[in-house]
Amino acid sequence: MVESSSSKTKFAQAHGRYIRGSASKVRRVLDQIRGRTYRDALIMLEFMPYRSTGPITKVLRSAVANAENNMGLDPASLVITRATADMAPSMKRYRPRAQGRAFAIKKQTCHISISVAPSSESTNSEASD
């Protein structure tokens, strides 16, 4: 999805919906890549020891593909401007316990949103040309 704000800065975004994993654990990773360039973020995600880096990488690549295909932007010039993880509905499961009881288990899910935009240095150099 491509949108532009009132200040004429264009950005591309992608969403991952109903991703298995708690929003707080995904936010821990997103806080590390927010504000970084696309290539730096990919390198960081590759070497982080968290399970949530897989879905985050997938959403990040989708956002960059949206910027490249829909807006014609160079992936090397893109910066992650917004990265959020919001709570989604929990999957409810039951674990059988002793004496006919059942304990409820909530399997957390989250929605991941990532926005990328050209870095200010690349837009300044294009404006001066």
Curated annotation (Swiss-Prot):
GO CC annotation: cytosolic large ribosomal subunit
GO annotation (BP), single: translation
Keyword field contains Ribosomal protein: yes
Listed GO MF terms: rRNA binding; structural constituent of ribosome
UniProt keyword annotations, A-Z: Ribonucleoprotein, Ribosomal protein, RNA-binding, rRNA-binding
Quaternary assembly: Part of the 50S ribosomal subunit.
Biological role stated in the UniProt entry: This protein binds specifically to 23S rRNA; its binding is stimulated by other ribosomal proteins, e.g. L4, L17, and L20. It is important during the early stages of 50S assembly. It makes multiple contacts with different domains of the 23S rRNA in the assembled 50S subunit and ribosome. The globular domain of the protein is located near the polypeptide exit tunnel on the outside of the subunit, while an extended beta-hairpin is found that lines the wall of the exit tunnel in the center of the 70S ribosome.
Family: Belongs to the universal ribosomal protein uL22 family.
Protein name per UniProt: Large ribosomal subunit protein uL22
Source species of the chain: Prochlorococcus marinus (strain MIT 9211)
Recorded name of the encoding gene: rplV
